[in-house]
Structures are given as C-alpha cells and as structure tokens.
C-alpha cells in the first residue's frame, strides 16, 4: 500500500573530499538524523561520495593527475563493505535512501545512484548515461541496463537523475511515461551566476539548475522534486586545488543552491548560504492530482500515435559468451555486481 503523506529530507552539505571512509560515516550520520526526525526518505547529491571533482573544470591535465589518482582511490564499489554499511543504516532507520556516489567497477568510474529501501536492499542501481563535458575525463557511460530511473515504492513511484540529466527531454519523457510522483534531482557543486564569464553560457552555473531546470522538471512532470546539492568551505577549496595553484578564498558562491519544489513548481524551501544539513518537506502525493489533471504527458495530454520514444534497456557487451545451444549468455550488471543477493543479517547490522 502506498503512503500518501510522509516526511522527506534533502542533503545540502559538504562532502568528505577524497575520503571514502569519512564520506561513509557522514552518510550514515545523515541517514540516522533523517530517521530520527521521522523521515521516510533522504536524498543525497550527485557523487556525494567522495565529492564532485569540480577541479576538473579548472585545472590542466598535468595538474589533475595527482587529484584524479586520489579520487579514484576513494571511489566506492557496490560490492564493498562501505556500501553494505550504508545499506545497513537504511535498514536500521527503516528509511529509503537515494545515494549519489562515484562507483568504481573494474577500472572505470561511473556517476552512480542507488535507491536503497528500508530493508537495506538496493531496489534501483543506475549510472548517468553520459558524463557532461569534462566529466568524460573521469567517468564512463552508463549502459542499457543501468539508466532506468523510476521505481515503484511504498512512497509512490520514485525517480532519480543526475545533474544535467534533469534537463534531458528524453529522460524526462521516459520518467513521465512511468508515472513518476517523487523525483530526486541530484546536483553536484556549482558556482553561482556572479562567477560567469563570457563566453561561458549561463547553463554552466548553479542558479539556472536550482531556479529554472529543477522547478521546470516539477512542473512538466507534476512531481514532488527534491534537489540536494553539495557545499564547499575554505578548507574544501584548498583540497580541490592542485599544488602550486593559489586556491580561491570565498566559497559562498558555491553554497545555498539546494531546493525542494511542489508538483506545480512552487518553492517549498531553499537554504541560506551558510546552512549545512537537511532540508525537510512534508510530502502529500495527492497534490500531484491537479497538476497531472491539467497536463499528464503520459496519458491524456500526449499523442503516442504521433510521437513515441524508443528505449533500449539491453546491455551491450564487449565480449559475449556462447551457451551450449549456440545462443548468447545473458546477464545483467545488477547480477554481476551481486545486487540481487539480500543484505546479510549479520552481527554488525544488529548493533
């Protein structure tokens, strides 16, 4: 049975830069805080663990190499003890967790999102389909079986997208077609519009993401939309600056960009620039009714006889295996990573 009214939270905080263990501990602390506050859902920013590598937008190739090595060393695998600890925290607090993290799989990093349910099971695991611009120097592409967003839950049909995926009209259409009701628009760290320098387009600063793209998503889909954002401190600026380069001294432009919007695009809450913590919202799924009554692009306000979207969720392998009957052995990324295996009922989980 779907709950129609419940409390949720979006994280706006500074990551533990280049620190997997610290990031896991801070994640668990926020899960505990949200659970103690009575939340049924807590949402984290894009690549919250081990932080968004914003330095890649600002440094040369040679300058990036020591930071890239350290970043990769602190990425998180889904079959790791660190990830299982986060799953246990979700189970202990009986809460849904939408987690953004830099996932390492073999030797490639991905901009990953996991949706963990109150039993600690991973009910959705996805990867950003296309890293944005210089992100391609750090991350790989998601595959056909790792990009679906919307998952049926007891909180409603919940979707997740990373950063500029939230303005991708095709992904938005796909989510609408699945009846999305709650959306996690996970964003990284971004400077504000006051830093914009010609000819860099305004698309590339935080304000349009917070105040144009995210409410537009809410309006067009008729969903409750939570936009968790990372923050930055003076110390964080130093950690994200290579040796020999003078770091910035004022982090304020990077802060205060998290938002929560109602299904009609109206603002629920925005933080002050100095706020670090959880933004809370009381969700009522019944508020989706009138927005979708006006414009349901998956139903009465669409013409599939004229416009349709083709979706391919199959995984394309570099190497395929032939079975004894001459067919191709099929398996999913989820199976290979062991995400179909239930979280063990171990002693640590009972603490």
From Swiss-Prot:
Noted pH dependence of activity: Optimum pH is 6-7. Active fom pH 5 to pH 9.
Induction: By cyanide.
Active-site residues from the entry: 46, 128, 163
One GO BP: cyanide catabolic process
Class of the enzyme per the UniProt entry, highest EC level: lyase
All residue ranges annotated as the CN hydrolase domain in the record: 6-285
HAMAP family found in the cross-reference section: CN_hydrolase
Complex and partners: Oligomer of dimers, forming left-handed helical fibers with a diameter of 13 nm but with lengths ranging from approximately 1 um at the leading edge of the peak to having approximately the same length and diameter at the trailing edge.
Function: Catalyzes the hydration of cyanide to formamide. Degradation of cyanide may be important for plant pathogenic fungi in infection of cyanogenic plants.
Official protein name in the record: Cyanide hydratase
Organism this protein belongs to: Neurospora crassa (strain ATCC 24698 / 74-OR23-1A / CBS 708.71 / DSM 1257 / FGSC 987)
UniProt lineage: Eukaryota, Fungi, Dikarya, Ascomycota, Pezizomycotina
